[in-house]
A protein has these predicted regions:
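Sec/Tat signal peptide C-region and signal peptidase I cleavage site
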Residues: 24-26
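Residue-level detector of conserved, function-critical positions
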Residues: 28-307
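Bacterial Sec-dependent N-terminal signal peptides
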Residues: 5-7
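Bacterial N-terminal signal peptides
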Residues: 11-20
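Short, Lys/Arg-enriched N-terminal segments with co-localized hydrophobic residues
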Residues: 1-3
């Protein structure tokens, strides 16, 4: 029932019976938790000093499913900061939160608010990423034709002119030039996103300037170690390697797959005799320190791994 759902969500907030700091997540005190629990239907743990609340809705714990209701925010003392007025909302981060409101045609349109509740980016975007490196990636258009812009916390918006743009990760965002192709649906079920992007990828800085030219057939985000897996189309499939933030190829694109480095090792795979995939490990120079020979493998953690 709803009380049980609320209790399970609040259990994180009441852990250790006080205010808890875990990164940017702050759990409110048990007294505040009880007051908020009595006032709202769903209460999330505090993030960036503010607590997301919902009135008139419910959420299934450990899932992304949620009801309509209205979203707002309270502080860690339980005082209302932003009254519940939005149809969708994310947690605060870097002093701002993405909020959404249904338009007359049923579309959810998103914007950005600051800690006082002031709208700094108007609610007119079909997707809006959280603030990273001082900007957020905004998207409008249709599923098959998307337009991307960068919006900063002062409300300035810059059109990018790319067909694809990811959120920023460790200072850079992936951009692409190409087209959206409808996914093949052999099962006859409704796909959450029926289109996928096909084209070439590069990377931009938070000011929108190109850092690594659009040239790769596939690419992933930069990790904290300053490396990103990138792919180049081979004769039969995309081959993967790694680049650094200057675009320098530090590991040649020789592998069927490549995971991000954990420490000084990364899991890679190759196609071997009979078309079988074999997994192994490389160092940061691309040398196979453990040859590709396993049916599966995981990244090194605490000097050990499983294969």
């Amino acid at each position: 029932n709803r009380h049980m759902i609320k209790h399970r969500i609040m259990s994180v907030a009441t852990l250790l019976g006080g205010v808890i700091f875990t990164g940017h997540v702050v759990a409110q005190s048990p007294e505040v938790a009880r007051r908020l629990d009595a006032k709202y239907d769903v209460v999330w743990p505090a993030v960036d000093g503010l607590i997301r609340v919902n009135k008139g809705g419910y959420r299934i714990p450990d899932s992304r499913m949620k009801s309509n209701g209205k979203y707002g925010y309270a502080d860690t003392l339980g005082q209302v900061v932003v009254p519940p007025a939005y149809d969708d909302a994310a947690d605060f981060g870097n002093g701002h939160a993405v909020v959404g409101r249904k338009a007359g045609d049923g579309r959810m349109l998103y914007g950005l608010i600051d800690r006082s509740g002031r709208v700094v980016v108007p609610l007119e975007w079909e997707r809006l990423g959280g603030v990273r490196n001082g900007v957020c990636v905004a998207r409008t258009g249709t599923a098959a034709k998307r337009e991307f812009s960068l919006a900063d916390t002062l409300g300035n918006v810059r059109s990018l002119g790319y067909d694809y743009c990811s959120d920023f990760s460790n200072g850079l965002a992936r951009v692409g030039v190409g087209a959206y192709v409808e996914k093949e649906n052999v099962a006859g079920i409704t796909l959450r996103d029926a289109y996928e992007f096909c084209g070439k990828f590069g990377y931009i800085a938070p000011d929108g300037g190109i850092v690594i030219p659009v040239q790769f057939d596939d690419a992933r985000d930069f990790a904290q170690d300053g490396l990103a897996p990138v792919g180049i189309q081979g004769k039969y499939y995309v081959k993967w390697g790694f680049i650094d933030k200057s675009g320098r190829q530090v590991v040649p694109c020789n592998f069927y797959s490549a995971e991000e480095f954990l420490g000084d090792r990364a899991v890679v795979s190759k196609v071997v005799a009979g078309g079988k995939l074999a997994y192994g490990y490389i160092d940061r120079s691309g040398k196979e320190v453990i040859p590709c020979q396993f049916d599966m493998a995981s990244g090194f953690r605490f000097a050990n791994t499983w294969v």
